[in-house]
Curated annotation (Swiss-Prot):
It holds the Pfam family Acetyltransf_11. This is Acyl-[acyl-carrier-protein]--UDP-N-acetylglucosamine O-acyltransferase. GO terms for cellular component: cytoplasm; membrane. Homotrimer. PANTHER family: ACYL-[ACYL-CARRIER-PROTEIN]--UDP-N-ACETYLGLUCOSAMINE O-ACYLTRANSFERASE, ACYL-[ACYL-CARRIER-PROTEIN]--UDP-N-ACETYLGLUCOSAMINE O-ACYLTRANSFERASE, MITOCHONDRIAL-RELATED. Belongs to the transferase hexapeptide repeat family. LpxA subfamily. One of its GO terms (biological process) is lipid A biosynthetic process. Involved in the biosynthesis of lipid A, a phosphorylated glycolipid that anchors the lipopolysaccharide to the outer membrane of the cell.
Amino acid sequence: MTRIHPNALVDPKARLGEEVEVGPFSVIGPDVEIDEGTWIGPHAVIQGPTRIGRDNRIYQFAALGEAPQHKGYQGEPTELVIGDGNTIREFVTCHRGTAQGRGETRIGDHNWLMAYCHIAHDCRLGNHLLFANSASLAGHVDVGDHATLGGFALVHQFCRIGPYAFCGFGSGINRDVPPFVTVSGQMAVPHGINSVGLRRHGFSRERIRDIKRAYRTIYRQGLRLDDAREALCQQLSHSADVQGMVDFIDNSQRGLLR
């Protein structure tokens, strides 16, 4: 049974699944779909077009699906799409996409967005991400599965954060961060691989050893990036993890953070 507090404002055209709960003074707009089991606390605002999956927890004063902060936006019906099992804490803002971009902002499954995080237009987030308080993404940013952003980390538009990467507190990121790499600093620089995170996720010693070798090849041998890529292909072709790093290099548009 759907439970809507009498002081909530839910547009009759909104579609809410079974066991959705909406707290007092929350506002749900007309072109919003919320799947079963999602809990929405008090004073949240969800505008559309927005699609939200199952079993999410959306806390007070979150603002989801508002128009993008983009001067070229002319009211096009772009979307925000949120998957299943996410936790979205107080004052988080997630904006819809733009017609000039992907037309949607997409957030995957089982992510944890702490208070005051900002997800701008046309971003694409994977699964099992952790964003600490006030981490912010500019437009068109991609973040791979299991990545972590520390509090107050800022990511420049069109950057990519690879799977299992770790971006420390207050990092300013203006280039692509490869998979498995740890970066930090006001103008972020690399500091090795995310060994703690990899161990926590069950990576074997052999996998971590190969990733460390790849990191040293990219960052510690003074090679041009093209030469480092070639060395990875020759020396570590057996490693699917390293191949993922090579693919990331090949698809980089802004260049790697080095």
